[in-house]
């Protein structure tokens, strides 16, 4: 949070002292650390914005998050009284039918309000519950947070087990479940009160094998947002390797309790370090596949209308990085029987980029949306403007010709293609692979993930961006139960040697 030039004096809320600089240091020195934490929390409760708090106390947004988490026990965006319920369901709701989900509003029906930082939109569990369960089925959320999934399960007549390792999150969930449904609206549905308790997703004690019909999980990202003030077992406090190691236990437990043929959905995103992406999402997908799951769908959760302007747009162009604007929602299935792995047979084509027009407003986030009839021209123009020129850009399109029973044959095919272009690639240049997920035998082959896994063994390539490209006019209906795959990926690698 940058200090504003509009405020010339700052007043200590504890002793009334006025000074020409933020009062945070004064409060800590004269009144103590605990008084400082409570003063910040009081300002938050009074409705002061994050920017105003940052200016008043001289703290960053990250510091504010840690202070609120310490004061309240859970990371929330506002400290307010329970909301007044104005509606019990979303208006004009329809099931999503493509692999890109984006919601204009976060969702504020029932007790949903989005105060819990990192909570997912209630549209996500509503879609999952309605698509993959029937009334009376059992839904499990092992990272319940503010209770979004539990509230939706109660509204939709499903049984629910809701657990979280943070006691403050459990208390918040219980508060959000304190409502009585009007029988005039729900007279045909049986209402089940969710079973809410403190619990560790790595050890789902008390839940029988093969007993759950749907798992909805939104685990804390490794080191992205602090969800607790130091609760033992909080995955958000771990670095990426530790996070993935603990998620293996989570995946194993989810596999154990899920019924064969049932679904497990996990919302997860990526991180960034040194202006390069860390593919936590694809690594997490790999963890669940190793546990025995099959990938039924791979949804891109897009931030709606996320287009940067001003400061962040300038920073994106100046330092050549894209702002993360998407997450992954892999929907796994516990197989009901044997289904042998089928390895994709790949082919690759080098795409020549010539005479690309200059882009007046270059893309600055990881989600690129273009008109369908002009998608490829605008996509290639953005690629060339950001990564081309003298940087020696090479674009390779990877496609699947067929599949065959096997294990890892696709690795050889991709590396063979790269061997043709890497000798000509210059240090500081870029190799970009255009890939799409494909569906075979009812399951999704995550070709982008497979490609990234393969290229980890090539030291001169450093993954810089995972870009998702999609048309602006997505279909609103579908004739199949499967989601229509509408997105593609651009995997941007920097040549380091």
Predicted regions: what they are:
Residues 2-18, 22-33, 37-497:
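Class I S-adenosyl-L-methionine-dependent methyltransferase catalytic core
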């Amino acid at each position: 949070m940058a200090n504003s030039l509009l405020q010339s004096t700052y007043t200590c809320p504890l002793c009334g002292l006025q000074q020409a600089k933020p009062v945070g240091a004064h409060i800590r020195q004269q009144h103590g650390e605990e008084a400082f934490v409570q003063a910040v929390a009081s300002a938050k409760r009074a409705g002061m914005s994050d920017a105003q708090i940052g200016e008043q106390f001289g703290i960053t947004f990250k510091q504010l998050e840690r202070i609120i988490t310490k004061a309240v026990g859970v990371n929330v965006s506002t400290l307010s009284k329970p909301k007044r319920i104005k509606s019990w369901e979303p208006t004009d709701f329809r099931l999503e039918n493509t692999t890109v989900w984006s919601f204009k509003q976060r969702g504020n029906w029932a007790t949903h309000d989005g105060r819990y930082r990192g909570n997912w939109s209630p549209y996500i569990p509503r879609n999952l519950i309605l698509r993959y369960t029937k009334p009376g089925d059992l839904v499990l959320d092992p990272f319940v947070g503010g209770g979004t999934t539990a509230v939706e399960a109660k509204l939709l007549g499903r049984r629910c087990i809701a657990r979280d390792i943070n006691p403050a999150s459990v208390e918040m969930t219980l508060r959000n479940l304190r409502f009585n449904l009007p029988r005039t609206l729900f007279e045909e549905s049986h209402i089940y009160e969710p079973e809410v308790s403190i619990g560790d997703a790595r050890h789902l004690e008390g839940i029988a094998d093969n007993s759950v019909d749907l798992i909805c999980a939104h685990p804390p990202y490794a080191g992205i947002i602090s969800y607790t003030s130091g609760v033992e077992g909080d995955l958000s406090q771990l670095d990426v390797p530790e996070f993935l190691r603990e998620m293996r236990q989570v995946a194993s437990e989810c596999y154990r309790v899920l019924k064969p043929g049932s679904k497990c959905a996990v919302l997860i995103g990526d991180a960034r370090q040194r202006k390069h992406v860390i593919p936590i999402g694809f690594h997490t997908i790999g963890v669940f596949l190793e546990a025995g799951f099959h990938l039924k769908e791979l949804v891109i959760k897009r931030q709606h209308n996320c287009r940067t302007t001003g400061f962040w747009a300038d920073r994106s162009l100046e330092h050549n990085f894209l702002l993360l604007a998407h997450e992954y929602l892999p929907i796994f299935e516990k197989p009901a029987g044997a289904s042998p792995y089928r390895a994709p047979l790949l082919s690759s084509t080098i795409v020549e980029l010539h005479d690309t027009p200059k882009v007046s407003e270059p893309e600055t986030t990881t989600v690129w949306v273009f008109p369908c009839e002009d998608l490829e021209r605008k996509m290639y123009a953005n690629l060339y403007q950001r990564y081309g020129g003298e940087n020696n850009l090479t674009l390779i399109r990877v496609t699947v010709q067929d599949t065959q029973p096997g294990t890892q044959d696709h690795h050889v095919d991709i590396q063979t293609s790269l061997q043709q272009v890497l000798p000509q690639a210059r240090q500081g240049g870029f190799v970009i692979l255009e890939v799409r997920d494909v569906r075979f035998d009812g399951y999704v082959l995550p070709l982008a993930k497979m490609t990234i896994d393969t290229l980890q063994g090539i030291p001169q390539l450093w993954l810089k961006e995972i870009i998702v490209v999609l048309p602006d006019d997505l279909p609103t209906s579908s004739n199949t139960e499967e989601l229509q795959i509408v997105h593609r990926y651009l995997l941007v690698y920097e040549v380091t040697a």
